[in-house]
Structures are given as structure tokens and as C-alpha cells.
């Protein structure tokens, strides 16, 4: 029996208040309005940005259903939707692409003005929610809201992908993999034969290492305080691994000494202010490029000596690896299907959705790279 046009009752993980576990609840998901799409989520990844909401580092209205990295199948569409149809495999886009705003039209920009990133309204574009639970409206997250068996997104926040692609793997392209990989190949524009460093070897950092390798870097130095991550980093392309705790000097000085004055490209993937500065300082002073990938805490400010930049270093940042979702995500899925890069080594656990809190415990304990939840 068709569910189009009807309210769907399904399971979702609701965060009622910060610093509390997720609660598996039955929620009601309203039908999509005009230019909206309702998606049956098949697989969704647990991202550290979701945990930043749980611990209060990222502010978003609560109660909310989090989740922003997923793959699913279109269940129904609202009036006026033309780019997807029921039955299509899709990836929701937490960075939308309207194609009309100034950012979307610029070839080097991807921050569509309609995105919820940074504004944290917790609603769809019309200012309302499609979720209710126990008679109360529940907020969306980043316009995609994937910790729910069904979700509703704006048409500009979803893209169709290869019908044969495995959603439990390509869901990583919805955030973490693209963020790291694109930071290397698209934002940093790593050059063949160059020297790169990546501060932190978590899932996004490993994806940046994959990107550096794909771009032809000659040396890729992984920096992490957890030596257990080094084997995986080397498996995916790191040529050297460095633990800052093994030295009695700042890590940027260690890297400068290892590379005859500094690396050509560095990537900060933690989101700490001190490591952002360190990643910049480890770059070669006349031409080094440092890319901020990690999400910093709210209301934090950096103080820098401008001479560090005046000498010739460049400091860049990007969200979602600089990718335009509708244009680039289908291409990334196609590249994965063509075996141009791996995703499997990044997935350490596949859990049923009900084990979401166990997945977050593993993330916080540093015992997982990526946990994927399946419905």
C-alpha cells in the first residue's frame, strides 16, 4: 500500500537534551510539501559533529533528530519536484545546492545561502518541522536529519546516485569521506610530488590521506597521539606517522625539521585552535598551504602573528571538501564504483539502528573510525 501523501510512523533517535543518550522513539513524519522529498533512510553514519551537538559544542535547537551522513531511497515527492522520483537511490546533502544563489553560481564556492549550517534553525526552509513525537514538534538537523527511518528534505538537499551503489558504504560520501578527500584534491589542490601532513588520523583525516595519495603526494605524514591509528593510516597512504607525545618540542618544529623547512600542504582535522595554528606553522613559509577541516567550538577566536602569513603561507578552510552536492556527489559515487578510492577501510562497525548509543560510545572512546547504522 502506498504511503505517499500520508503521515508515516517510524523509529527515530531523539535527543531530548544535551549530554543525554539518544532515545529511540516512535515519531510521525509528515508528507513532503511542495519542492520537498521524503526519503527512507537505509544507512547512516555516526559523525563527530553529531556528538558535538550532544555535548553542547555545537548549538542547535532541541529536542532534535540528528544525523547528516546517509544513503536512502526516495519514498515520495512533493509538488514541483523534478530531480528525483520515488525509488531513486539518493544521498541527502547537509550542504544544499540551489544553483541560483551567488555562492552556488561561483565555481569555487559551495556554501549555498539556503543551508542551515551555522544558522541552526532546526527546520526546513519554510520554518517548520515535519517531525512530531508525543504531540511535540521535533527539530531537524542541518536540513537532512538522518537518525530517522524516514526523513523529509528540500529538493535542493538531495541528489540521485547510481542505482547499483551500496548505500551502507556510499553513505560516507554524504559527509566524512568527501570532507577529507575534497580538502586535499579540491580545496588544497595537493600537487604531485609534494609533501603533506595530516593532523589527526580519524575517519576524515584518513580520507584526507586518501586524497593526498590520489593527488600524487610523495610524502604523507600522519600526526596523531594515538599510535593505534598508524597502521590504518599507512594502509591508506601515509608514508610516515608521528606522535607529538614522543617529542619535547612543538610538533610543527618536528615537521619542519623532517621536511627541510616545512610541508607543502597541511590539513587540520580535529577542530582545536592550537592544532590549527600548529598546522599552519608546519607549512613551508614561502608557499605552504594549510587547510582547516575540523569544526571548531562555538564562540572561539584565534590570535595570530600576521608575519606567518605575510611570508607566503596560505590559510584556507572549507566545508564538505568544497564540493557542490548535486554536481559532485554523484561523481564521487561513480568514482567509488570505478574503484578509484576505497571506503571499506573506513567502516569499522555496522550496527542495527537500535545500537546508536553504543556506536557513540565507541566514537568517544576512540575505538571506531566510522560506525554505520542500518535500518
Swiss-Prot record:
SUPFAM superfamilies: GroES-like (SSF50129), NAD(P)-binding Rossmann-fold domains (SSF51735)
SMART domains documented for this protein: PKS_ER (SM00829)
GO cellular component terms, A-Z: cytosol
Catalysed reaction, written as an equation: a primary alcohol + NAD(+) = an aldehyde + NADH + H(+); a secondary alcohol + NAD(+) = a ketone + NADH + H(+)
Binding-site list for NAD(+): 200-205, 224, 229, 293-295, 370
Residue numbers of N-acetylserine PTMs: 2
Modified positions (N6-succinyllysine) in chain numbering: 234, 340
Subcellular compartments: Cytoplasm
Protein name in UniProt: Alcohol dehydrogenase 1
Amino acid at each position: 500500500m502506498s504511503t505517499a501523501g500520508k503521515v508515516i510512523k517510524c523509529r527515530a533517535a531523539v535527543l531530548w537534551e544535551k549530554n543525554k543518550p539518544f532515545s529511540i522513539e516512535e515519531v510521525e513524519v509528515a508528507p513532503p510539501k511542495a519542492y520537498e522529498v521524503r526519503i527512507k533512510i537505509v544507512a547512516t553514519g555516526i559523525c563527530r559533529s553529531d556528538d558535538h551537538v550532544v555535548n553542547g559544542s555545537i548549538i542547535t535547537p532541541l529536542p532534535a533528530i540528528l544525523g547528516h551522513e546517509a544513503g536512502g531511497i526516495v519514498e515520495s515527492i512533493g509538488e514541483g519536484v523534478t530531480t528525483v522520483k520515488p525509488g531513486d537511490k539518493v544521498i541527502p546533502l547537509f550542504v544544499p545546492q540551489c544553483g541560483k544563489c551567488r555562492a552556488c553560481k561561483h565555481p569555487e564556492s559551495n556554501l549555498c545561502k539556503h543551508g542551515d549550517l551555522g544558522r541552526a534553525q532546526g527546520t526546513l526552509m519554510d520554518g517548520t518541522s515535519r517531525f512530531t513525537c508525543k504531540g511535540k514538534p521535533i527539530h531537524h538537523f542541518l536540513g537532512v536529519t538522518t537518525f530517522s527511518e524516514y526523513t523529509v528534505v528540500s529538493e535542493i538537499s538531495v541528489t540521485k546516485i547510481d542505482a547499483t551503489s551500496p548505500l551502507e558504504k556510499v553513505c560516507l560520501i554524504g559527509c566524512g569521506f568527501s570532507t577529507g578527500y575534497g580538502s586535499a584534491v579540491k580545496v588544497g589542490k595537493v600537487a604531485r610530488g609534494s609533501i603533506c601532513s595530516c593532523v589527526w588520523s580519524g575517519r576524515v583525516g584518513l580520507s584526507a590521506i586518501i586524497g593526498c595519495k590520489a593527488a600524487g603526494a610523495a610524502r604523507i605524514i600522519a600526526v596523531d597521539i594515538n599510535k593505534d591509528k598508524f597502521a590504518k593510516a599507512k594502509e591508506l597512504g601515509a608514508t610516515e606517522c608521528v606522535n607529538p607525545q614522543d617529542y619535547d618540542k612543538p610538533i610543527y618544529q618536528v615537521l619542519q625539521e623532517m621536511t627541510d623547512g616545512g610541508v607543502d600542504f597541511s590539513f587540520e582535522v580535529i577542530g582545536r585552535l592550537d592544532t590549527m595554528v600548529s598546522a599552519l606553522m608546519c607549512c613551508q613559509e614561502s608557499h605552504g598551504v594549510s587547510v582547516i577541516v575540523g569544526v571548531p567550538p562555538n564562540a572561539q577566536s584565534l590570535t595570530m602573528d600576521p608575519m606567518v602569513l605575510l611570508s607566503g603561507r596560505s590559510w584556507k578552510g572549507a566545508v564538505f571538501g568544497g564540493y557542490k552536492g548535486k554536481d559532485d556527489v554523484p561523481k564521487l559515487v561513480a568514482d567509488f564504483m570505478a574503484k578509484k578510492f576505497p571506503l571499506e577501510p573506513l567502516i569499522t562497525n555496522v550496527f542495527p539502528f537500535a545500537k546508536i548509543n553504543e556506536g557513540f560510545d565507541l566514537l568517544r572512546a576512540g575505538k571506531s573510525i566510522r560506525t554505520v547504522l542500518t535500518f
